[in-house]
């Protein structure tokens, strides 16, 4: 995967370096696209937002929205479709050009709805092993983890 992802000049950023590196890219006026692969469940200490996703109470990652709002960066959803083995098309859908003007969690909710449409269109294309629902919200505010 590393060779595929770096073949055309792209590079990965470690999760713990994301904010610093993206701020540096913006400060240096580096023309770039930052892509978040955000279809996995958040870690236990990052359960900030819950929504109904595929008819399940689900925690959704909020990091991409928080970074977009902090740096006022446009948000684009990439809808990937497999044409045939090894060939894909990508449709870009503008979520917002002005994240600071949107209500809190609006971007995250739009992401959840767009991702849900993609999955319902082609369920076999989603990697179901991400354990999307391993965390359960409990009314008392405590967290129950299912294995």
Where are these regions (language model features)?
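Membrane-interfacial amphipathic helices and adjacent loop/beta segments
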Residues: 1-16
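Non-catalytic C-terminal accessory region of glycerolipid acyltransferases
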Residues: 16-147
